[in-house]
């Protein structure tokens, strides 16, 4: 939405756009999510959001044993679960449709599972890399393992797979974001996600 007004959203919807996102806005807030859902409810359209509380997201890897072992600044798992909880609370309050793009923690799986039990209109996806790689990979300092959301623990992988099997997670996504070679051939902390 970042600067787009509602008339533009209506025009885009009339042209065939089926969903809108705030995912790349660093200004995402409770107010932005609420206003987005209010606007999109009027045209029965989906909001896609990337669950990340920016105030906790200035690290480069999952916060935990491996980030501490190698001395890389961690992104705490609550960065994701706080955003999921917040957005679902807003969804429950005003209604609408929301899709979480890129869940990676067992807490998020549990919260979304509960929301689906309450019949909230929520879907989500998991990046394929969060299903096959865990945060132990960062000990290599290979910048290719600097991804968003960060690689999490083996317990998270187990919960994500369970979420796929029980229908909590709707989509396995690539989350492929092509990078210029120079943005990955550098120190881990300076590399792009």
Give, region by region, the residue ranges found by the protein language model.
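Active-site anion/phosphate-binding pocket segments in diverse small-molecule metabolic enzymes
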Residues: 174-181
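Aromatic/His-enriched, Gly/Pro-containing loop or helix-boundary segments
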Residues: 1
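Basic, amphipathic juxtamembrane/active-site segments
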Residues: 182-189
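Histidine/acidic residue-rich metal-binding segments in metalloenzymes
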Residues: 4-172
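Gly/Ser/Thr-rich active-site loops/lids in small-molecule metabolic enzymes
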Residues: 80, 189-193
């Amino acid at each position: 939405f970042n600067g787009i007004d509602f008339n533009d959203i209506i025009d885009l919807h009339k042209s065939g756009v089926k969903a809108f996102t705030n995912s790349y806005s660093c200004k995402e807030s409770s107010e932005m999510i609420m206003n987005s859902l209010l606007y999109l409810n009027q045209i029965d359209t989906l909001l896609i959001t990337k669950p990340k509380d920016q105030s906790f997201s200035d690290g480069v890897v999952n916060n935990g044993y491996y980030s501490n072992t190698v001395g890389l600044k961690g992104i705490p798992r609550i960065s994701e679960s706080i955003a999921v909880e917040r957005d679902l609370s807003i969804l429950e309050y005003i209604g609408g449709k929301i899709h979480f793009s890129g869940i990676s923690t067992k807490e998020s799986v549990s919260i979304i599972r509960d929301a689906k039990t309450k019949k909230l209109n929520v879907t989500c996806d998991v990046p394929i890399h969060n299903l096959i790689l865990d945060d132990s990979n960062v000990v290599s300092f290979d910048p290719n393992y600097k991804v968003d959301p960060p690689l999490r623990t083996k317990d998270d992988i187990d919960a994500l797979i369970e979420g796929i099997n029980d229908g909590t997670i709707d989509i396995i996504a690539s989350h492929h974001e092509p990078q210029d070679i120079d943005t990955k051939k550098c120190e881990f902390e300076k590399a792009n996600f």
